[in-house]
């Protein structure tokens, strides 16, 4: 349940202005500022990176974090900062942190924050704001930020005094990780972050009104200032608050053990939620192997079973679900990706496990009905299920029959009318990709093909936006991934359309020494849309792009750009290996691959 509040409304807010002078009066001589309090809490919570696009409202936070050894990574767009924080949250098991300036700096993050909400990523967004006395009075970049972010975040708070910073940040970090993880937002008015002497100077009234009104104004400002800093530097606990994660009951687990033990054709659909902390991904993999049940992996769970597991089924999911006598939805939601539940057979027993009650039962009143619905953590549930079924294994002929039909229906060796066959390009990348690679998916048609062909080598090695289908995640996700796993090879799979959102982050990759490889499928078209728009509506309007020299753009930002066309087909492997070598030597690389049209993804659009 969302928790939105302004600290001034809380019982433990601290002294009111009337009592600010007593006991907790501001220590005027202390040369500290509120940004230091923020930084201290972040360090105590193990935060290693803060992503930002700098602004005067938030400078104290950035400077203080850097002094405490927290790495400040500045991007070329605020959305990238949040996407990078999202990637850090997914890969590190901690909260990702982004700090942006007030007004337009914050509104630029809206799509990225909504994406984190729908992807269930614990992200802390901290935004600057106009001073406490100037909000609503026409100050620079002053808008009602709280109303904007309440629908997007689990928790929103506006700090009203310096002493509230530490408890607010601690609470936000705990809420971000509890229950169903998600983004949280804290607004910092500028006068809660800067030192007393500077704020005091701004509070000074030039030529105050004469008489009683002048005295009242002077008293009010003095009292407000004192209250703003009262108790600011009292010793407070900095360390993490408990995080609550819902779990299945013993009775629920036992009932599921009985159902699975009787099943002849069970299937597991594993979703991103199964990768959430605290259960290590390797433990979940061992549990799945122990169960021996064929699995379809989606979202962040791609790669959970490694590259070539006999249990990982990639194709013909609809047919498998029609034949299955038991389906376990482990963090998987019956939304558009499962045709709102219509692909589930009414004859199957269905076990659904999800931390979020709404997602757990989505569309269950229309197209499907769970036999057992568990509001709990999918990862730990799978561990307990496998422990309860020790000695029992799914009949081997069932996964073997599904695997036999698991052949990609493709024509990778066919020549396209122009340029390279995208399927061939992707096959060569999959063959040459390092075993420690992390794949970032940012695009439509080309990325859709990549999802079939590229095989993540292990858990937490595939990053895509999730249910929101957001374009533009590539630069930020790759930045966060490379910082978390500096020794890993990080690939961004871009469509030429989606590249436009974050190609400027090649500047960030260069400045922050985070070398990645961007593979751009350049067909000069928004092909995901064009595939359906043209046959249905008879027009390609707004779908056309150009065979732009994106490799030159990468060069201009300090990276290494290479164009690959049909004339380069015989040396495709060499060019891919050269890109890998460039990144090992510290240089971000962009492969601008000119691709032709195939019919591989006809009928693939989802609306």
Tell what function each PLM region has.
Residues 5, 127-169, 187-193, 200-208, ...:
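Glycine-rich, acidic loop regions that bind phosphate or pyrophosphate groups
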Residues 53-55, 73-83, 98-105, 160-163, ...:
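Active-site nucleophile and cofactor-binding loops and adjacent substrate-binding regions
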Residues 90, 99, 269-359, 456-488, ...:
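Glycine-rich, anion-gripping cofactor-binding loops and their flanking helix/strand elements
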């Amino acid at each position: 349940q969302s928790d939105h509040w302004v600290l001034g409304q809380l019982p433990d807010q601290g002294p009111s202005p009337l009592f600010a002078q007593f006991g907790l009066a501001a220590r005027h001589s202390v040369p500290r500022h509120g940004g230091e309090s923020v930084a201290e809490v972040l360090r105590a919570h193990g935060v290693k990176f803060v992503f930002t696009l700098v602004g005067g409202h938030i400078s104290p936070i950035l400077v203080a974090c850097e002094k405490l050894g927290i790495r400040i990574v500045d991007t070329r767009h605020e959305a990238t900062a949040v996407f990078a924080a999202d990637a850090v949250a997914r890969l590190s098991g901690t909260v990702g942190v982004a700090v942006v300036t007030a007004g337009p700096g914050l509104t630029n993050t809206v799509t990225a924050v909504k994406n984190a909400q729908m992807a269930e990523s614990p992200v802390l967004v901290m935004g600057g704001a106009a001073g406490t006395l100037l909000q609503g009075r026409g100050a620079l970049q002053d808008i009602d930020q709280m109303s904007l972010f309440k629908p997007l975040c689990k928790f929103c708070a506006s700090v009203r005094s310096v002493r509230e910073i530490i408890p607010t940040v601690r609470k936000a970090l705990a809420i971000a990780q509890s229950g169903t993880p998600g983004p949280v937002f804290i607004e910092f008015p500028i006068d809660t972050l800067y030192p007393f002497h500077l704020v005091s100077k701004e509070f000074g009234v030039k030529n105050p009104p004469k008489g009683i009104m002048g005295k009242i104004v002077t008293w009010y400002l003095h009292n407000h200032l004192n209250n703003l800093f009262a108790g600011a530097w009292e010793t407070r606990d900095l360390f993490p608050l408990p995080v609550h994660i819902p779990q299945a009951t013993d009775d629920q687990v036992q009932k599921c053990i009985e159902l699975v033990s009787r099943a002849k054709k069970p299937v597991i659909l594993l979703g991103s939620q199964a990768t959430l902390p605290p259960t290590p991904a390797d433990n979940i993999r061992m549990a799945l192997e122990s169960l021996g049940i064929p699995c379809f992996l989606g979202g962040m769970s791609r790669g959970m079973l490694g590259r070539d597991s006999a249990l990982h089924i990639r194709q013909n999911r609809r047919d498998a679900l029609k034949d299955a006598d038991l389906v376990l939805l482990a963090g998987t939601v019956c939304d558009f990706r499962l045709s709102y539940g219509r692909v589930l057979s009414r004859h199957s027993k269905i076990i659904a496990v999800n931390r979020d009650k709404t997602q757990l039962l989505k569309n269950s009143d229309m197209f499907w009905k769970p036999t057992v619905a568990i509001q709990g953590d999918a990862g730990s549930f799978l561990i307990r299920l496998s422990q309860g079924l020790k000695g029992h294994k799914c009949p081997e002929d069932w996964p073997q029959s599904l695997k036999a039909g698991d052949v990609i229906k493709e024509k990778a060796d066919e020549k396209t009318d122009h340029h390279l066959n995208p399927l061939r390009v992707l096959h060569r990348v999959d063959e040459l990709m390092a075993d420690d690679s992390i794949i970032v998916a940012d695009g439509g048609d080309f990325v859709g093909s990549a999802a079939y062909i590229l095989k993540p080598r292990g858990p937490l090695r595939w990053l895509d936006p999730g249910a929101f289908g957001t374009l533009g995640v590539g630069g930020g996700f790759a930045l966060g991934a490379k910082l978390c796993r500096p020794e890993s090879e990080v690939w961004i799979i871009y469509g030429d359309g989606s590249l436009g959102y974050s190609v400027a982050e090649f500047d960030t990759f260069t400045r922050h020494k985070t070398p990645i490889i961007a593979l751009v499928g350049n067909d000069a078209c928004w092909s995901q849309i064009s595939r359906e728009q043209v046959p249905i509506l008879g027009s390609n309007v707004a779908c056309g792009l150009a065979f732009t020299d994106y490799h030159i753009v990468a060069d201009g930002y300090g990276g290494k750009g290479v164009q690959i066309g049909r004339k380069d087909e015989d040396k495709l492997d060499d060019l891919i290996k050269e890109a890998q070598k460039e990144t090992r030597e510290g240089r971000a690389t962009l492969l601008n691959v000119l691709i032709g049209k195939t019919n591989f993804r006809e009928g693939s659009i989802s609306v």
